[in-house]
Amino acid sequence: MYSAKPYDRRSFDAANVEGRHGEPIEIQYHEARLNRSTVGYAAGVDVVCAFVNDDLSADVLELLAASGTTCVALRCAGFNNVDLDAAARLGITVVRVPAYSPNAVAEHTLALMLTLNRKIHRAHNRVRDRNFSLDGLVGFDMAGKTAAVIGTGQIGAIVARLLWHLRCDVVAFDPVVKQGLVDLGVTYVELDDALAAADIVTLNCPLNEHTHHLIDEASIATMKPGAMLVNTGRGALIDTAAVLEALKSVHIGSLALDVYEEEGDLFFEDRSDEILDDDNFARLLTYPN
């Protein structure tokens, strides 16, 4: 297992006990990420367990196949870091998590919206500094606002239902229309129409060649001035440079990111004692909205 954290060890060790799923299997844990320099750790193993920031390009897969690996098990839903054509050519089976807890991600998405709207993060910091002023902490009623859900898969569908229960007017964009959402009152529209109508935009779609930089300068121009944007999908759904300019001009009124386009060198590590050399990320951290 590459990119192994203490919580990974605890979860896998708890599940890897005799009698639960047959005989226990031998698991080798490595904190290092999988790449050409670390692929040797997997010499002779049948299965490699990888995470979102591990390198599963053709070069790495060829080295894995040469050393006897026949399966790559992703402990994530996304697979854009895997060269699937190379895996098929090499006879390596690739499996993934079909979905994280859809409810957990959907609830987190809603929590980010409420945090932005009600300025909960700012209020928390003020109270710790014994500043009990309410100035600048006023939000808006989400009831009656238009929310655009971009992607209505397992997670997006739950987000749409949660927003409907908050009495938002929910519009959605997805190539596949879910009749259950339509019956609830969700209206499916084209992407530009969804962005133009929405006070709140949430991205819950996969990353592929069609959705890369889905939110860019052109699509931002179609959005309502002051709209809220939340991304709990994939980092590269957003053109970070374009979003930064929109934040600066307040065309995007507020932004919540659970993912980031260049997160591979940042996330899942303690960077508190380091200088961030990613200028876009550093700029994002300076904005109050």
Which sequence ranges carry the predicted segments?
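A short helix->loop->beta-strand "cap" motif at the edges of active sites that frequently abuts
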Residues: 66-71, 90-92, 167-168, 225-227, ...
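An N-terminal-biased, well-structured beta-alpha scaffold segment characteristic
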Residues: 1-94, 216
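Phosphate-binding beta-alpha-beta segment of Rossmann-like dinucleotide-binding domains, i.e.
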Residues: 90-92, 98-146, 158-161, 165
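Short glycine-/small-residue-rich Rossmann-like dinucleotide-binding loops
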Residues: 52-53, 199, 205-207, 233-234, ...
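Rossmann-like dinucleotide/phosphate-binding beta-alpha-beta segment
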Residues: 135-225
